[in-house]
Structure formats: structure tokens, C-alpha cells
A protein has these predicted regions:
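Extended extracellular/luminal ectodomain segments enriched in beta-structured repeat modules
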Residues: 1-2, 6-9, 108-113
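Alpha-helical protein-protein interaction elements
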Residues: 2, 18, 132-134
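Predominantly extracellular/luminal cell-surface or secreted proteins
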Residues: 5-7, 29-33, 50, 117, ...
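Extended, low-complexity, turn-rich repeat/linker tracts enriched in Gly/Pro/Ser/Thr and Asp/Glu
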Residues: 5-22, 54, 122-125
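Short coil-to-beta strand junction motifs in C2/discoidin
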Residues: 11-30, 137-141
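A generic structural micro-environment signature
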Residues: 12-16, 36, 148
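Extracellular ligand-binding interfaces
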Residues: 19-81
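Terminal, low-complexity interaction segments
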Residues: 56-57, 61-152
Length: 153
């Protein structure tokens, strides 16, 4: 289990750009590349998040708490919304949303590697002075990570 803080203007499954419409993915993998023969489909959680508003004519949907490409309204499954921005108001980055996440994976072995990463698409993450602001546009942080072992006989 862990707390995931989603900062800024995540766009969910689609970003609304007329070209190169790509999702903002967040990925959790168990044992990535440790066992190249094994099917990793059950050891991977791929989802999207959206901090966008949702109106009848404009709504950038997210997958969470389901796997991508499932569609839910923005901020579905959140624990807390409208937390402080990660950056000052000099950039348009949005608020922070907290998700308390619990995931389980089957595993047998003496060691485990858990990898958390994103595939964010940020073509417009440039401030008024032309400086790239990726962290302020879309980023995330993790807190309170707990790994538990449950033994089944």
C-alpha cells in the first residue's frame, strides 16, 4: 500500500490535442525484467489519472481505479482533492490529488523489485518565458510505502 500524490494537469486517457493524442500513464511493475520468460501481464498495473475538470462538453477521463484504457471521471477513487500545488502560481500547473492505493501481486522468491514510473505526454509544459516546466505541469510523488508478505499454505 502507498499514498500517490498526482500533481498538476494530468490529462488522463486523452489530452484533447488534435494531433498526437496520448494518455498520461502511471505504471507499477513487480520484478520488471528479472524474469524475461514469464508473462508479466498479471504483474503490471497500468492506469491513467486526470486532474482535469469535467463538463458536459469537455471531460478528460481517467482509468484509475481500473487499468488503462477503462474510462472513469477525473479524480475517481481519490482520497483527497485540491491539495496545494507543487509549484508556485508562476506556472499554470494544477492542484494535487491524493490516492491511497493497495495492490497485491503473487510472488515466490527471495527478493522482489517493484518499479513505479510514468509515461507522461507534456507538449505544452512551457511557461510564458519559454522555459520547460515538466515537474509543474505533470508529476507525482509517493509516500508511506508498505510492503507486506502474506503466506498461503
Amino acid at each position: 500500500s502507498f499514498d500517490l500524490y498526482v500533481h498538476g494537469t494530468w490529462d488522463g486517457n486523452f489530452n484533447g490535442f488534435p494531433e498526437n493524442d496520448k494518455p498520461d500513464k502511471w505504471i507499477m511493475e513487480l520484478d520488471p525484467e528479472m524474469d524475461l520468460i514469464k508473462d508479466t501481464s498479471s504483474d503490471r498495473f497500468v492506469t491513467t489519472f486526470s486532474n482535469s475538470p469535467c463538463f458536459s462538453n469537455y471531460c478528460l477521463r481517467q482509468s484509475y481505479p481500473e487499468m488503462y484504457p477503462f474510462e472513469n471521471n477525473p479524480k475517481t477513487g481519490n482520497s483527497k482533492v485540491d491539495l496545494p500545488k507543487i509549484c508556485k502560481d508562476s506556472f499554470f500547473g494544477g492542484e494535487t490529488t491524493l490516492y491511497k492505493i493497495e495492490k497485491g501481486f503473487r510472488h515466490s522468491g527471495n527478493a522482489v523489485v517493484i518499479r513505479f514510473y510514468d509515461e507522461l505526454y507534456q507538449p505544452n509544459a512551457i511557461d510564458k518565458d519559454g522555459i520547460v516546466q515538466s515537474k509543474c505541469d505533470e508529476s507525482w510523488s509517493l509516500d508511506n510505502l508498505k510492503v507486506r508478505v502474506i503466506s498461503y499454505n
